[in-house]
């Protein structure tokens, strides 16, 4: 256990703006919470330079065969698992490319296992279980910036030469000093003292969204602002796939449905076939040559 006193942490401080939250009407209570929530986006904005550095590192790692691994305990761990689990259906990547590891294992997603966060060795074991290597990126998430489980992971990753990123909500935390890149949106005291699932959790979610989304954009998973590597695995996503191709190409539904059927609902390939007027085999060859970047593939044939 680290020796940082909790009373020195911003996230554990008492919020003077909400000290009467238990004595006001419901609407006033919610206004208090909402006023605090408004501070979150501003805190994240102040960290954009550091977030950009992290996105560039993650994108570079992806292009070189690396992965993005999140580690955290409690709410922080759950947020990592949540962000990771959304990447395959949204961007068509493997479930191994972005992974979330929570202290205490899968059961900790649904039932708190708070004691698991106190072990540095447990995180090292968890990282070894997923074959974490020097080409991978480790993002350690903890509102306090002092969680032993996460610190153990960051230290291990540093030791094998991997890039490390910390996402915390306390300035000058131990994690911030260990990680290669520190992201620390300081959201201030919580509406309910110490309840870091609130503002801190929201800030962490926003940062993780930026990290994964930014890296996917950097690696050609987005064309314009369209998710062109979407996997059409249900009726809603089938319709979304059709709309994406229509929006990207300006083509009518009938043509889009025909091309999507030909490509087995490969959205990116369908778009490039329409934009290039090439057949499936030639279009795929050029796309593959350009590592899936539609813009670069179009430049090649222009």
Curated annotation (Swiss-Prot):
PANTHER family in UniProt: GLUCOKINASE REGULATORY PROTEIN
Gene3D superfamilies reported in the protein's UniProt record: 1.10.8.1080, Glucose-6-phosphate isomerase like protein, domain 1
Coiled coil: none
Biological-process GO terms, alphabetical: amino sugar catabolic process; N-acetylmuramic acid catabolic process; peptidoglycan turnover
Lyase is among the record's keywords: yes
Protein name: N-acetylmuramic acid 6-phosphate etherase
Catalysed reactions listed for this entry: N-acetyl-D-muramate 6-phosphate + H2O = N-acetyl-D-glucosamine 6-phosphate + (R)-lactate
An example molecular function term from Gene Ontology annotations: ether hydrolase activity
Domain of life: Bacteria
Annotated keywords: Carbohydrate metabolism, Lyase
Miscellaneous comment in the UniProt entry for this protein: A lyase-type mechanism (elimination/hydration) is suggested for the cleavage of the lactyl ether bond of MurNAc 6-phosphate, with the formation of an alpha,beta-unsaturated aldehyde intermediate with (E)-stereochemistry, followed by the syn addition of water to give product.
Enzyme nomenclature, EC number: 4.2.1.126
Catalytic residue list: 86, 117
Organism whose genome encodes this protein: Clostridium botulinum (strain Okra / Type B1)
A Pfam family assignment: GKRP_SIS_N
Record's subunit section: Homodimer.
Function (record text): Specifically catalyzes the cleavage of the D-lactyl ether substituent of MurNAc 6-phosphate, producing GlcNAc 6-phosphate and D-lactate.
PROSITE patterns: GCKR (PS01272), SIS (PS51464)
Pathway(s) annotated for this protein in UniProt: Amino-sugar metabolism; N-acetylmuramate degradation
Matching InterPro entries: Etherase_MurQ, Glucokinase_regulatory_CS, MURQ/GCKR, SIS_dom, SIS_dom_sf
Bridged cysteine pairs (disulfide): none
Domain SIS: 58-221
């Amino acid at each position: 256990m680290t020796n940082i006193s909790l009373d020195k942490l911003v996230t554990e401080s008492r919020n003077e703006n909400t000290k009467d939250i238990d004595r006001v009407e419901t609407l006033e209570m919610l206004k208090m919470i909402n006023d605090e929530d408004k501070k979150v986006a501003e805190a994240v904005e102040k960290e954009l330079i550091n977030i950009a550095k992290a996105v560039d590192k993650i994108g570079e790692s992806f292009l070189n065969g690396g992965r993005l691994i999140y580690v955290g305990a409690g709410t922080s761990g759950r947020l990592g698992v949540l962000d990771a689990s959304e990447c395959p259906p949204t961007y068509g990547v493997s479930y191994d490319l972005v992974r979330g590891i929570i202290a205490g294992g899968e059961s900790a997603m649904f039932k708190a296992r708070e004691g698991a966060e106190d072990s540095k060795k447990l995180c090292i074991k968890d990282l070894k279980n997923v074959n974490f290597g020097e080409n991978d990126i480790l993002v350690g998430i903890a509102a306090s910036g002092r969680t032993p489980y996460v610190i153990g992971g960051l230290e291990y990753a540093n030791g094998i030469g991997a890039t490390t990123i910390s996402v915390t909500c306390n300035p000058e935390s131990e994690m911030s000093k260990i990680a290669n890149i520190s992201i620390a949106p300081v959201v201030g005291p919580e509406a309910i003292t110490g309840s870091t699932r609130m503002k801190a959790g929201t800030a962490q979610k926003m940062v993780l969204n930026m990290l994964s989304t930014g890296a996917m954009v950097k690696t050609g998973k987005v064309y314009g602002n369209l998710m062109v590597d979407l996997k059409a695995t249900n009726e809603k996503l089938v319709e979304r796939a059709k709309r994406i191709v229509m929006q990207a190409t300006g083509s009518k539904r009938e043509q889009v449905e025909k091309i999507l059927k030909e490509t087995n609902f490969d959205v990116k390939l369908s778009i490039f076939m329409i934009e290039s007027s090439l057949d499936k085999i030639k279009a795929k060859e050029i796309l593959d040559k350009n590592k899936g970047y539609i813009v670069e593939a179009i430049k090649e044939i222009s």
